[in-house]
Amino acid sequence: MPCTSTTDINIHYQRKGTGCPVLFLGGVGGDLRSQPNVFASPLAENFDILTFGQRGTGLTDKPDMACTMAQYAQDAAAVMDAVNWDSAHVVGVSFGGMVAQELALGFPQRVRSLVLCCTAAGGAGGSSYPIHELSSLSPAERSRKMLAIGDDRFNEAWQAENAEETERMLKAAAANASPFLSEPGGITGITRQLEARSHHNTFDRLPAIRIPALVCGGEYDRQARPEVVRNLHAQIADAELCFFAG
């Protein structure tokens, strides 16, 4: 996997496909070694996809130091430099959507268009669910909580009434968990991401974004709640809004 260096870390990245350049920014703990990833999606069949392990994840360095969303955006710009991209269409999912906002604000000339999926603006627009507050729960309690946060149709009441199906879903989630979190710095990297996520706030600055934008959300998502997604959308002039039944 190719690597590029910034002033303080080495970043591993991957690029595949042909067509218009698309920078993909994934969620907390994203690891390019985990399968399936973005390259298994239809995107890779139609675009030149570039993505990378954000600091603290995957094969990228994992410094135990506080980091802001703006710094994560600087890392993204550095990866674009590594492949000689002046600009690209940017797709950000969840945490990656927050990084994408900072990239569009801090490096406007480098973002051709913006797709923000299940993410939030923070501040007066509302924030995504504070996942960092779940660290005190047992693994079993946290898994049940995350099931409900991910889709409100599987809330606590539903779980109580559907114990067998709940256990099946929890086992499936455990089977899909990253096998790389036990590596040195794995948990620390995610902790630092969640810290940055908890301070994310672009709400008042978003009107400065003047490029084509699409904001997407899930109707039953409790992590990036529909009202939070709508608030984000309302701050970007002429942005499109789309909700999925999930």
Regions found by a protein language model. Name each.
Residues 5-65:
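Conserved HGGG/HGGXW glycine-rich cap/lid loop of the alpha/beta-hydrolase fold
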Residues 222-228:
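Conserved alpha/beta-hydrolase "acid-adjacent" motif
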Residues 101, 105, 112-144:
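Flexible "cap/lid" loop of the alpha/beta hydrolase fold
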